[in-house]
């Protein structure tokens, strides 16, 4: 079985030359009818063909890299190599060597990679002036001394200060690997990377086992194993004083039974003072029990959709909270600083497959209140957290659209093909806008057109938006008239533009 294996540096400095080698095993590189090439994939992008060599000796390069790239074959060692000069940050990518069938070049970016039949595993190459550095690893644990019996204990490894990316994290209980969650890497301002990984385990299981997280950083050839975690609740049980429960997550006053042994002499007084000092430290640092949630709560406020403002003459606000335990969470509303007397709809607590929970509350007001600039506030209340408030306020400097156009992008040629219409609207603020299509005054299903999120206009505080409608070939000689309808929260009327594909006219209207 033919196998390909890339080798080379994982880190290259800007302006230097990247040298990679692909070792071929399981078959001769001289075999006729094949092409040997290099392909790369930058982060977040598609595959990009670099170049390759045909068995006849002909070499082909990507035109965008010509002048920087050299590919050569060493048949005596059964390998082929890549040299890429003048490296820059744009050359950071996963590099693959591959074997393909004729033709000897492929536009991988368009998906025509059917000719590739053998791939290497790939090697990550980073272009940076920062030196290679192994990560620092720190153990973290849930910060509670009295976990609930039915609550999980969350262990975490903070992995930081390494370069280049990336690291591999594996969790073990004893010798058994454990399912874990590793978060996406973040590049710090100093160009070094950081990430974290966490493991959630039942309290009883944590008391019985030994846990470790293993971090491997290929570029620095380092491997770090973190074994030691803070002392378990089982070991602390004998020294824990009786706690008087208070609000969950707040500091509690801890008390112990009075000593029954009479202290005599100076030695007894010193022991008594030491014991009082220990009790004081316990009172200052101990919480009665872990809050039932293990992840921070996130609260979000959605402002009214333009559809509701126009079609229902209502302003609907949705406030929702996400976390791992929301049974004690409560959402409240204020309108202009006062509690509303109606219009509030409470959603049910929802549990999701990833272990998280969500809950929402919806407030509906007359559109006139929102247009008048009335403030709307949603507050998340939870026993273990300070209140979290989010306020929605209509932009005072709103501006209605000033220009609407409807153009034919492509006509049906041949006649049985589809046509495309482009509707553009500009000069409005804020960016919330409703754009819909009508076919002979009937609303077109949203699956038939593609709207775009309004970007800001260059050099202006206003926005513009567009939508493309696919018009299928007419089933009869009588074509339909298509209308683009636009509404904005600051518009007094609906704007519309129409076009008939047969007579090719455009009319721009004000109110419908």
Swiss-Prot record:
Coarse class of the protein's main subcellular location: secreted
PROSITE patterns per UniProt: IG_LIKE, IG_MHC
Bias (Basic and acidic residues) ranges: 267-287
Keyword annotations of the record: Adaptive immunity, Cell membrane, Disulfide bond, Glycoprotein, Immunity, Immunoglobulin, Immunoglobulin domain, Membrane, Secreted
Chain positions covered by the region annotation Constant (C) domain: 130-512
InterPro entries: Ig-like_dom, Ig-like_dom_sf, Ig-like_fold, Ig/MHC_CS, Ig_C1-set, Ig_sub, Ig_V-set, IgD_del_linker
Cystine residue pairs: 22-97, 157-213, 319-378, 423-484
Subcellular location per the Swiss-Prot or TrEMBL entry: Secreted; Cell membrane
Pfam families associated with the record: C1-set, ig, IgD_del_linker, V-set
Glycosylation sites: 238, 255-256, 260-261, 354, 445, 496
Domain of life: Eukaryota
Region (Disordered): 225-296
UniProt subunit comment: Immunoglobulins are composed of two identical heavy chains and two identical light chains; disulfide-linked. An IgD molecule contains thus a delta heavy chain combined with either a kappa or a lambda light chains. Kappa light chains are found predominantly on the membrane IgD (mIgD) form and lambda on the secreted IgD (sIgD) form, this fact is poorly understood. Membrane-bound IgD molecules are non-covalently associated with a heterodimer of CD79A and CD79B.
Function as written in the Swiss-Prot or TrEMBL entry: Immunoglobulins, also known as antibodies, are membrane-bound or secreted glycoproteins produced by B lymphocytes. In the recognition phase of humoral immunity, the membrane-bound immunoglobulins serve as receptors which, upon binding of a specific antigen, trigger the clonal expansion and differentiation of B lymphocytes into immunoglobulins-secreting plasma cells. Secreted immunoglobulins mediate the effector phase of humoral immunity, which results in the elimination of bound antigens.
Record protein name field: Immunoglobulin delta heavy chain
